[in-house]
């Protein structure tokens, strides 16, 4: 059990923390034909949009209620009414995800009450589903905002009691922020390989996978989980929740569906991935496909090839709780040593990490820890690039945002293929970091210049 070591710093220097609204917006982008609506000042949404465009290198649908000083003091209910009415009329979305911010939460805005009042005054928009999520910036981090959207989706859109009909070939997949669009594509392929139909929430692989969509820019998400499938999640045969932060979401889903809810912290170890595949084979009644067995064999071969380079290497990690859990287990499974570890917040779930200490803090705290406890690798987002250069450490990019290399937002880390490629990446980084010593050349050597040019032969007098 890890000890959560809290510092007395009154400020954050080079923070790794991103607020709840960013996580909530990211989860909202995985719902089909929806649009996130941020209840706050224009700067709240503009800052988030810059982050997402840097990360995905694609336009992102996002709107704001544009609170100003007057509405902040006198009340901003009218801003919500105007924004919802405008979006429903102009964009015709299937769903709107209304998110609070630190500004609206400090004001005391009750967005659920405002939406109920909007339903009464604008009955013509009853066909548009509106989800309300409280995501204050001053509490938690991106991970909390992401999981809050999934919890609200289950509470507000999934029927409270399972329906009589059961779809025996359908499986629910709740995925946390640690799963990239590439990871979600791999999960979908695995489930479909067993003859099952997955409902993935949120399905970023359909909306934010970096595909070139037909037509002009759309103000709505192009792809994602259909609202109709979300409403039918209670009829599924089984459910998986991948991510420690989805514990409450899986607890909310359990009484709403007939099938079992299986919680997995991640799929970055052979044991966890085997458990996932075994459950799919069990509920489907089918044998494991040959391509999955081959990928497992490729992973085992990669473990043998990379063992001599990774054994005993120290891995420093600065990331959200779910990513810390995944990378710590991955490091231990490959004979590496995780630590030092820095998390953006001191969530109690960090105590379950298989290390001695976790520091809730920022990159300055990680810098201090690296001075006392050197590492061989650094796992963090792109903001840690300068820190990696300072300590001459290879940077393995993980988390959010990833803006200094193309394609990192969809890199596969989960599953057999993700672990295989990650092993090769880490081993190559360690090999490149190896510093070769220059050959000793005696100052008494005759004609050193000519000996270098002639392959070491001495010139005759």
From Swiss-Prot:
Keywords, comma-separated and alphabetical: Metal-binding, Nitrogen fixation
GO BP term, example: nitrogen fixation
One Gene Ontology term of the molecular function aspect: metal ion binding
Domain of life: Bacteria
UniProt xrefs under PROSITE patterns: NITROGENASE_1_1
Record SUPFAM superfamilies: Helical backbone' metal receptor
InterPro entries: ChlB/BchB/BchZ, Nase/OxRdtase_comp1, Nase_comp1_CS, Nase_Mo-Fe_CF
Pathway(s) served: Cofactor biosynthesis; Fe-Mo cofactor biosynthesis
Residue segments, region Disordered: 441-461
Function: This protein may play a role in the biosynthesis of the prosthetic group of nitrogenase (FeMo cofactor).
Record-stated family: Belongs to the NifD/NifK/NifE/NifN family.
Entry protein name: Nitrogenase iron-molybdenum cofactor biosynthesis protein NifN
Gene (name only): nifN
């Amino acid at each position: 059990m890890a000890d959560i070591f809290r510092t007395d710093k009154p400020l954050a220097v080079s923070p790794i923390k991103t607020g709840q609204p960013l996580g909530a917006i990211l989860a909202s982008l995985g719902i089909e034909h929806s649009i996130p609506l941020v209840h706050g000042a224009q700067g709240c949404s503009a800052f988030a949009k810059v982050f997402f465009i840097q990360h995905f290198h694609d336009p992102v649908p996002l709107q704001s209620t544009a609170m100003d000083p007057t509405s902040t003091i006198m009340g901003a209910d009218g801003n919500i009414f105007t924004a919802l009415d405008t979006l429903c009329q102009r964009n015709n979305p299937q769903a709107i995800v209304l998110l609070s911010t630190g500004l609206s939460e400090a004001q005391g805005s009750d967005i659920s009450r405002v939406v109920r009042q909007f339903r009464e005054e604008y009955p013509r928009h009853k066909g548009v589903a509106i989800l309300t999520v409280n995501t204050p910036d001053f509490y938690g981090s991106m991970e909390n905002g992401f999981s809050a959207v999934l919890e609200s989706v289950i509470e507000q859109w999934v029927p409270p009691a399972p329906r009589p009909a059961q779809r025996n070939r359908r499986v629910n997949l709740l995925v946390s922020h640690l799963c990239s669009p590439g990871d979600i594509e791999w999960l979908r392929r695995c489930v479909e390989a067993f003859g099952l139909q997955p409902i993935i929430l949120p399905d970023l692989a359909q909306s934010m996978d970096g595909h070139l969509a037909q037509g002009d820019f759309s103000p709505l998400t192009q792809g994602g989980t259909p609202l109709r499938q979300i409403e039918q999640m209670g009829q599924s045969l089984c459910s998986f929740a991948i991510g420690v932060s989805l514990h409450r979401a899986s607890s909310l889903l359990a009484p709403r569906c007939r099938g079992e809810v299986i919680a997995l912290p991640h799929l970055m170890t052979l044991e966890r991935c085997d458990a996932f595949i075994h459950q799919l084979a069990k509920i489907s009644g089918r044998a494991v496909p040959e391509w999955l067995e081959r990928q497992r064999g490729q992973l085992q071969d990669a473990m043998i090839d990379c063992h001599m380079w990774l054994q005993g290497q120290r891995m420093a990690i600065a990331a959200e709780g779910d990513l810390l859990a995944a990378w710590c287990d991955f490091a231990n499974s490959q004979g590496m040593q995780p630590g030092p570890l820095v998390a953006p917040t001191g969530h109690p779930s960090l105590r379950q990490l298989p290390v001695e200490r976790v520091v809730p803090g920022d990159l300055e705290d990680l810098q201090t820890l690296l001075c006392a406890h050197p590492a061989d690798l650094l796992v963090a987002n792109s903001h840690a690039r300068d820190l990696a250069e300072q300590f001459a450490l290879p940077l393995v990019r993980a988390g959010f945002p990833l803006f200094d290399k193309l394609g990192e937002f969809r890199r596969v880390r989960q599953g057999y293929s993700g672990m295989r490629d990650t092993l090769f990446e880490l081993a190559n980084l360690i090999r490149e970091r190896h510093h070769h010593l220059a050959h000793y050349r005696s100052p008494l050597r005759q004609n050193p210049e000519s000996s270098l040019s002639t392959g070491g032969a001495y010139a005759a007098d």
